[in-house]
Amino acid sequence: MNFRTLLRFTVCGIFAAALLLSSRLDAQHLTLEGQTGGFLTPTAYVVYTDKGHVFSHPAVGYHFVNTSNVIGNVQTVSFVEGFANRAEVGYTRSIHTLGNSAAFSSLWNYNGMNIFSGKVVVLKEGTGGELVPGIAVGGIVRTGDHFVSGALNKELGLGSDTANTNEDLYIAATKTWLKRPLPLLLNFGWKATNASIFGLGGQSTRFGGRAFGGVGIPLPLGHGLAAVPSAGFTQEPPQVKNLGDILVGGKAHIPTTLDYAVRITQKQKPHFSFDLGIGQVAGNIGQTAVATGLPAPYPPVVLVPVDLKARKVLGMGLSYRY
């Protein structure tokens, strides 16, 4: 397996490394979009604030997702501030490079987008009993999202290239159980969103509800470190604005994102984490008709599969809290 293939695993595995570890998994573990959580999915934790303080030390994150074949590689840089272990706000800049497909990569020929996030803990983990999960509500706003929907707006002659704004509003419930016989980290949530594949897939045709979640198993490594093998999922909106206009049947097939990942971090009061994962995102999403330009008896059009070649992607992430 060469380096390019290896690095193609990301988008998701990443997502689910959405699982943390020790009793302080609420510290600096940031998602691709700059929230405390796994690689992609948010948890009910926020950036840790020292006792007696209102403001946390800032947490920073860097993530890389290799989807170079069609979509193009994605990098994000995040800065997040926590407040009294009750809330956090953050800013993430998504940096994008052009993919390698002459046929389809033009739909992602943009520098990236801005991502603003916020989260509030409404119920702290363990309130009223050790089995009670933490519950948080939060939101994301992505601005300057030209991907797919914006690009097709111009290519289809519907208007100018459009920079869309899309949002997520979510609730997440998270429980870390570190007792025998089996330590577990469980995270499940629901979001209302109008973004496809976290904005990378464009704007969905409507605002709708989607589920996400994951499970991890915290394992001690020695020297104060722990590993969290995990698996997770994120449901995607069924359709993308403008995309059906170029597909046979008028509909795309956007599958649920799956991920399998490992997170390495400190067991107590963690200041860093490293994520590495394999994800299954989107592959063949449909067919498009392409004119042959040939005279009869040759067919006037041929059907070409629209393959995003992102069913096996590699991602990595680094997070650090000062």
Model regions: which residues?
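Residues on the lipid-exposed face of transmembrane beta-strands in outer-membrane beta-barrel proteins
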Residues: 62, 77-81, 116-122, 171-175, ...
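Detector for outer-membrane/organellar transmembrane beta-barrel domains
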Residues: 158-250, 256-257
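Outer-membrane beta-barrel "beta-signal"
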Residues: 115-118, 122, 280, 291-322
